[in-house]
Amino acid sequence: MRIRFTKMQGAGNDFVVLDETRGTLGLTAAQYRFLADRHFGVGADQILTVRPPSKGAAEGVDFQYVIHNADGGEVEQCGNGARCFMRFVREHHLTDKDTVRVETLAGIIEPRMGADGRVTVDMGPPIFEPARVPFDTAGLDPQPTGSWHTWHLALGTHADSAIVSVAVLSMGNPHAVQVVDNVDTAPVARQGPLIEHHPRFAQRVNAGFMQVVDRSHIKLRVFERGAGETLACGTGACAAVVAGIRLGLLERRVDVQTHGGVLTIGWEGEGHPVLMTGPATTVFEGDIEVPELP
């Protein structure tokens, strides 16, 4: 099967974008993995699919936004991808609106195209209840910090174990954020997989490593669930800033420096949505022959 694709990136987080507004391609998990493969496919952190609203979608929804990780699994949300989604539907003349309502597994989001070409996404309010992350707190005691708390997680075997302190929340997908002294030397490669697959996270988790530079500036690395460390993670940036605000470390508007670029995150507090602003760029377009894979 030969398909048309668009390669895009937002702050270095890269995507293959597929247009299914005129009909579904019916790709399997193995075929999504093929497209994401950097040696045999196109190469991407995630595969993003544009579809019409689903049956029973809320009134006023313009599109459905479907996300598959590089491992082929479907996930709830991707912030950097949402910005690329907005640029895609504008550049491909699927809408002429500056703001669209988009249906995801995590709920409705509203990307907005700015006059400067950057895209702002209303990511909705963060979720703090452990059961909704989901995060199993049985036998754990919260560690009060600022106006919130963190949790101690044991990682690794007895011979090579560590205790890390993480703030746990959901931005439509689960995040565990820890504050580190130096993000460049943080043990992302070692601890990231252990946190991602920690048994207390039933759906696995994105592991964030945040260095607070000052109250309006952080540096961030994220080991993404199903993708590994990426150059940037939009929901990870949102989760880190929200955690930092609740822990008393950050102001309401923060620039997040990732390896791929800068994202600006704003949050006014409990019950308010998180707003994420950043770049979205088309890299190239093409066609690829996708083999029949189960």
Swiss-Prot record:
Q: Where is the active site?
A: C78, C233
Q: Name one Pfam family in it.
A: DAP_epimerase
What residues bind substrate, as annotated? N13, Q46, N69, G79, N80, N173, N206, E224, R225, G234, T235
Primary subcellular site in the record, as a coarse category: cytoplasm
**GO function terms (MF aspect):** diaminopimelate epimerase activity
Which keywords label this protein? Amino-acid biosynthesis, Cytoplasm, Isomerase, Lysine biosynthesis
Taken from the UniProt record, the cysteine pairs bridged by disulfide bonds within this chain are: none
Where is this chain's protein located in or outside the cell?
Cytoplasm
Q: Give the catalytic activity.
A: (2S,6S)-2,6-diaminopimelate = meso-2,6-diaminopimelate
Q: Kindly indicate whether the keyword Isomerase belongs to this entry.
A: yes
List the GO biological process terms: lysine biosynthetic process via diaminopimelate
Under which pathway is this protein filed? Answer: Amino-acid biosynthesis; L-lysine biosynthesis via DAP pathway; DL-2,6-diaminopimelate from LL-2,6-diaminopimelate: step 1/1
- GO CC terms on record? cytosol
Site residues, Could be important to modulate the pK values of the two catalytic cysteine residues: H175, E224
> Broadest EC class?
isomerase
Q: How does it assemble?
A: Homodimer.
The protein's role, per its UniProt record: Catalyzes the stereoinversion of LL-2,6-diaminopimelate (L,L-DAP) to meso-diaminopimelate (meso-DAP), a precursor of L-lysine and an essential component of the bacterial peptidoglycan.
Please identify the protein, giving its name as recorded: Diaminopimelate epimerase
Query: What organism is the protein native to?
Result: Variovorax paradoxus (strain S110)
